[in-house]
């Protein structure tokens, strides 16, 4: 399964659509800050499941039932999804990774900092921050049991697209 991961879109719908066209994902995760961008993407691509959480800028932009954190199997892999503000990621990712491990996640997805990051911790936990949509995005690939690939896309990767 190929998952496109976006965050902090702040109305960068053109970039988000370019990412969908380039990656051709099986699912999209939107990690908040302009929750309604995720809903608009879902309307544009009804065949692609969109999973999203609310960010700190979404207080008045999202439905009352919107969650700030989700943890469930995506492509056969347990994924912890959050915007990151409640885990205070601007001060480091220690609390984020501890929460992901507490939930038994194999992957921790977060945003909020606008700084892209993709790495694997010593214990095997994948950590992905796609940065700010409009400048970067993340891609997570699984084989139904484990992460097979995790990488970042930048504006440069999408330059050949109209």
PLM feature spans:
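Active-site environment of divalent metal-dependent phosphoester hydrolases
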Residues: 10-14, 35-39, 57-62, 87-92, ...
């Amino acid at each position: 399964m190929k998952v496109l991961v976006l965050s902090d879109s702040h109305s960068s719908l053109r970039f988000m659509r370019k990412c969908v066209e380039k990656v051709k994902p099986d699912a999209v995760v939107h990690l908040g800050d302009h929750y309604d961008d995720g809903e608009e993407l879902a309307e544009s691509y009804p065949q692609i499941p969109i999973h999203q959480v609310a960010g700190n800028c979404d207080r008045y932009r999202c439905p009352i039932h919107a969650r700030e954190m989700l943890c469930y199997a995506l492509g056969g892999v347990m994924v912890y999804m959050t915007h990151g503000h409640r885990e205070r990621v601007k001060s480091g990712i220690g609390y984020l990774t501890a929460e992901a491990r507490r939930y038994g996640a194999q992957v921790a997805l977060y945003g909020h900092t606008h700084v892209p990051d993709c790495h694997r911790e010593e214990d095997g936990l994948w950590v992905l921050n796609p940065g700010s949509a409009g400048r970067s995005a993340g891609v997570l690939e699984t084989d139904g049991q484990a992460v097979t690939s995790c990488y970042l896309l930048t504006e440069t990767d999408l330059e050949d697209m109209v």
